[in-house]
């Protein structure tokens, strides 16, 4: 998603550790994870999240709250695809840029649906709006696939939304990093 950042990281590892960096999507992970989508169109962060949760017996929906809000569907050891929605902070920034009278707001969880001022109304709209988006997408995946899933939240705003679903949700803060480490251990066997 951020090629310039990846390029800087790649150069850093080459300069200071004399080693090459590879993206997960470009590595042979076929015995670890079956990828059922076009590899060129999936982010390595999403693959890392999938690798982190695979256990050959459970189905997972991983919701990653980052620049985008990603929903990834993993069945047993297969990455089946997902959903990409706009990230909350990105959407907030865009709203204040495009609507000059809307202030730039630091997102906070709202307990009241009806806001009493602009800031509380924005927080309410984003909290309840994204809660509905998350709930609807997860239920739509379940309905369409006719499977049961364990739900994992990760990323910066994961804890804020944990209790906004009726389904049981587990928070895994280091999911992406754990997936990269799991892939590295697999590749270095």
Give residue ranges: language-model regions.
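Short beta-strand scaffold segments in enzyme catalytic cores
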Residues: 62, 69-74
